[in-house]
Amino acid sequence: VALVGGEAAYFGLQTQGSAPTGKIAIFSVWGGQDADGPEYSGPFGGEGTGMTVRIRHRWEPGRRERLVLAAEGDGWWRAEVSGRLVGRIRVDATWGGIAPQTVMWTERYAPPLRRCADLGHAVAIFGEPVADGGVRPLGHRNHLAPNPGCPGSFVEDLDGGVRHVMGAPAAPGP
């Protein structure tokens, strides 16, 4: 997500976290000024700088997870996954709310592929985002980034959301 008048943030689930290791829930904001969380909070660098909070979260394939991001006032943003606090990050209090455009994505978080078989098969289903107790998007656009020539990755619309597939044997037919 982007914050009006500020920078970008992301919130999601990962298979291989660092501090803590293993499956995690993570919330990060570029340009964040402070962070507080039950397991890990601190600065990040590498692709810009900011603050991050993370918790161990044993998500399971096929289980629905509810991610909630809420403004708490005085520049603080709170992230929860399935009712559990991931943490809070403080940004410049002049930044506004969530910008009108948001992005949901899947990412292979690993070294570059040496062969297509290394991609593996993964599926993520995203429900339609809802803001401020019921505000829903007017529309959406699917985009698939270029892949290294490996077949089987696609994005498709579902009733109330989208499905991201990576490394499938073949894309669905018409």
Report residues per predicted region.
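Secretory/extracellular carbohydrate-interaction modules
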Residues: 1-41, 54, 145-150, 162-174
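Short, hydrophobic/proline-enriched secondary-structure or compact coil segments at domain edges
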Residues: 25-29, 100-110
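Secondary-structure transition/turn motif
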Residues: 30, 81-84, 141-143
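Short, surface-exposed beta-strand/loop "edge" segments at domain boundaries and coil↔beta transitions
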Residues: 33-40, 85-86, 109-119
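Short, aromatic/His-centered strand-loop micro-motif at the edge of beta-sheets
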Residues: 42-66
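Carbohydrate-binding surfaces in secreted/extracellular proteins
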Residues: 59-87
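Short, solvent-exposed beta-strand-to-loop segments that form ligand-recognition rims
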Residues: 81-99
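Activation corresponds to long, low-complexity, non-globular regions
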Residues: 106, 111-174
